[in-house]
C-alpha cells in the first residue's frame, strides 16, 4: 500500500516538473511555428482552430 502511494507521489512530482519546465518550451516552439506559418499566410487556419 505504501509503495503504491510513493509511486503515485513520484509520478505526480514528475508530471508537475514536466508541466513547469517543458510546457513553456512547447508553447514557445508552437508559437514560433505559428509565426512561421503566419508569415507564409497559413496562420489564419491555425488561429481559427485555436
Curated annotation (Swiss-Prot):
Organism: Bacillus subtilis (strain 168)
Name this protein carries in UniProt: Uncharacterized protein YpuE
Biological classification of the source: Bacteria, Bacillati, Bacillota, Bacilli, Bacillales
